[in-house]
């Protein structure tokens, strides 16, 4: 077979091989850095890692000059384990093929590049920042309808006047924020003003607290205190929402019992406890009145202000209108409860083999855009365990850390609204009381089977187990008028606690390339390579407006930060504080990073903060290593699968093309034979005549 035929055979596969450079740049460093982790923990072996990496790159350059692949690989992998050696050999063979059959000269250009694991530079093309959308175009972007009835200038004007009156006390007393004895009172006034301004403004303040790459530390600290406990709406509106969502069926048609008093009320929705017709204790989440139209109206005002300020030259680098646009989209997603139900399904699927992590389950068909019915998951707020220094705390810290690392590094599907209010803890006692709760409801339903639904009313608290005396023998309930003669607590053996994650309306997903970048940054943190980490941030930034001198300063200061990691054990590194300082440098030197990237960093900071309160000895970086490796194995295996699938497809396509060509040739031959035969017959006929 000629070289040309070989090239044709793998022509579609060649594209995959070119893309393979992205994986090898990431995978090689991740497969190798695990060895470096062990060496750092033992305070030895750093040089072996660097020497191995240097030989690894020389080996690839050697392959690029068409020398013997196998002998060179075996001679330059001293000190590496068998797995690393195997992957090095595999990657070398791929590169040998790629460089012999394409015009890829990237390896030649990287001979003098000493960055760790950098076989082929991945230079992310600069994303051109689009022209600023005006406020009306921005609304169209988040709702898909420019002619939205709520975007009415008269209504907007009235709302602006209303907000002006609400904000007036804070504006007039603004100088007080500089007076030491009074400034805390002023900040408290501002926070309460934002709370009173409505859903969008509360969420806007919370969003600001998650972007230390854009806003100063003081603002981040103060706005992180905003909470979403808001006034509840009427039970009548809840009933109307349920009827409108489920084909006119009322609460009495869908539930055996429904608590009219909400369990909690947030900025977007409120939740009630109920009992479904099949005897399941459930939570019913109902959107507040006009929440979507209010979000769109207030978003229009916020975006208009930011859009006006963005024309100031000093503000342009922030690209705030783009960030606010992403904020608006996330707000609209949180107001779609069908989407939240799909998120719950995804999380339950991702953690189906992990019994220590629990997400509520949507109870179909009782799911709509305005109403979501999900399983009731009893538990205690995680802050209760932090305050009393419970013996479960170290276990809880490990469970939470593992869950978040799986979301971020393996599943690439991350809960983006993690705060203590959205995390509950369930112990074995909670499981017992949940069983009592369900049995109580079922017994009540069976005993009153002949009664009409409107006749019953259960006068007990929302959490039934709060009213139950913890007895190992019997329990008599006078509140419901029913006596449960014997409820035995058989599960008194100690079991590991479980974490329950709530409110998953907002999630974060990174593209594959951004995910690889995030993992690369983690790798450089572990290795203590500050300058390489700075180069990563600049290389993958959406925009970096640094002069050469500023870029040099940025790299030097990053190097100083990373040296702190290099000189410490991984278990002693405070990742949250470290990443906060990184984002501070990003803001100071005007390096614009992706919003999802910043969200993940903030999630990591919040997670470590909770984890350290539960277990001060928690080491986030050390615990992340298995998940980093697992994510790379998944990426690598998916690539291999995809590569061979595409190669098989291209081979099949080539065979089909060859068969088609053969068929065409045969058809042409048959046509020629028929034409010749017809001509001969015609000549014979003429001759006979």
Curated annotation (Swiss-Prot):
Q: Name one GO cellular component term.
A: mitochondrion
The Protein kinase domain, residue ranges: 257-689
The EC number on file is: 2.7.11.-
Binding positions for ATP per the UniProt entry? 263-271, 285
So where's the catalytic machinery, residue-wise? 417 (proton acceptor)
Keywords for this entry? ATP-binding, Coiled coil, Kinase, Nucleotide-binding, Serine/threonine-protein kinase, Transferase
Molecular function terms from GO: ATP binding; protein serine/threonine kinase activity
What CDD domains does UniProt report for this protein, alphabetically? ADCK2-like
Q: Pfam families this protein is in? A: ABC1
For the keyword Transferase, the answer is yes
Top-rank lineage group of the source organism? Eukaryota
Query: Where is the region Disordered?
Result: 42-79, 652-689
Compositionally biased residues, Low complexity: 655-683
Q: Which PANTHER family match?
A: AARF DOMAIN CONTAINING KINASE 2 (PTHR45890:SF1), AARF DOMAIN CONTAINING KINASE 2 (PREDICTED) (PTHR45890)
| Similarity section | Belongs to the protein kinase superfamily. ADCK protein kinase family.
- What is this protein's name? Probable serine/threonine-protein kinase abkC
Q: Which organism is it from?
A: Dictyostelium discoideum (Social amoeba)
Taxonomic lineage: Eukaryota, Amoebozoa, Evosea, Eumycetozoa, Dictyostelia
